[in-house]
């Protein structure tokens, strides 16, 4: 938002230097990105009026202009756009132009030129802010400029502009008046609101035009004013100067007035040629299927029923809140103007603007939020200025279709809560005075009842008022204190604590957190080699996707991890060891989609080598170890790993289902080579994904204390021969079950294949620890347990003791 300093001073008595005011605004939460001095790089350039033009006697491409520049001057020019009565910029003898060029009296084919007529480029001006006609020739100054006046003053260049970087919630400051309110609140200076009510003459507008709203969900209010008998022409110098300083190009007096009021009050306006409106009707409706409109930029655009249009009795005449139509454009022949001042739904305007590829100052304001109560005043002010600057007559009354009224917003504010949150000791009277500076109505002595004006749509709760008090009081004046609430973690819900514990455990295991988009494209599922009937193919589709690659909600965290891994690998950032804890989306018919919480991770590359350990590949067992450390840290019990070929995106033979009893928690495995090729990963990679809420159900949230053993343990080794396809975990399960309460611990310490073990078999050796907490075990009890284990292994797994 560009705020010309002189324009700002029209509404608030501010005398601070611009740089100092910029600092105060920034400290109050309105960040000033820059202070731009418009002082021009030229001297001795004045306004002049061309009195006569005569051909050059000896050059067909030159003319001789007799110019009143405070004194009579003869100037020779080759500009194609000069005409008698035109106000121009005249560089006098001795003038200096940008780049150091100095102007002297010169003779052109025997005719003396006592100066030079200047173009926008020669004056160092932004050519986008001058008319297309003036870009190829000399610049035309406003017709009310005085001959001999400083051209820099006429062009509004002796000014300073504050460039504000506004946060999305401060839509009220997308106007000079909004910034003026802030300046008044910060400095205590009085604010002066502009006059709005026009003089009226002639028949009532209600007998000359009608307005109908058929889409009240997209248009809450529509105000119309009628101005008759206008004369289209250039705007006065002051208006053109303000518009240029604010970054807008002057066009004509009527259009300039609508732009001026949009910048002044924050309310976008549109001016229709009243005589070109069929039936003199305004209908605010959705577009019809395939309906088309040619907008002011000359482009024919196809509309759809999701878009809001302004129509007359026959056709759409504007895309609501985005751009007007060419059919009812204000032209030099226009004499009667219908002014539109409306409130359109911001989300609808945003969608329409994006689909049509059209963004404008108006659409930006509607997207951020426009003051619902400000439409009548803006229409009145526009009518008043058109009467003053375009010679029009304002029809009495206005049409105001207000179909969706704003409900007053009143917020309760507790002074003690303010001081608690800020760490201050402000008196309630001080808080009240600070809020009243912002034109908030404050009732009561505490708690206060604070009524919010319509233009402050960002104030919705008590915490917003606390912020307003803090920024006006001064962040730099708030004392440094410890937070008043040091037990926030204890007040977290169990689900929140479990989620945070997952992040801490994954980070402690050496994984870096990533956060990826919740929406992906169908191609991401194709890359995972998923068959058409795979559950992940049933996705939640986005109705209005930004693009095809973001058209469905993710059924898994794996696509996002693959994208991050690919981006890192393409930049040679290896190894990759990442995780994400987030929600996936599962369709549930007509009900709201399910959003289960998942923990997923991916590793790729080799571990860094150290002085006492070699580099190693991040393979299946490396990632399994990470998961085991996470489970151990969070006391997730009874986890088992079962070889599986059920996952088409994992390498057959290097994949496992993670289970707890019969409950499936997730998967772990090396990615299939075809998947690696599809996502262009240069090395083997392994991934896992867990149902994190299910894992939480198994976790021992409160550690269980067990007394240290007082009686000695008995250790025995057991080596058995089993078929080579028998999982070691299955053997351990049988041993644990048969050992009963005597068996305290079991650990696999040797795996062997080869002679003398029979072919097709393997030897597994386990260390068994027997112990009871209340007495010493006898050899007979331990021997009996060993025999039970051997019989169970033989009966259930066909195992035999290794000789």
Swiss-Prot record:
One of its GO terms (molecular function) is phenylalanine-tRNA ligase activity. Binds 2 magnesium ions per tetramer. Residues 39-152 form the tRNA-binding domain. Mg(2+) binds at residues 458, 464, 467-468. It is found in: Cytoplasm. Its main location: cytoplasm. It catalyses: tRNA(Phe) + L-phenylalanine + ATP = L-phenylalanyl-tRNA(Phe) + AMP + diphosphate + H(+). Tetramer of two alpha and two beta subunits. This is Phenylalanine--tRNA ligase beta subunit. It comes from Moorella thermoacetica (strain ATCC 39073 / JCM 9320). The gene is pheT.
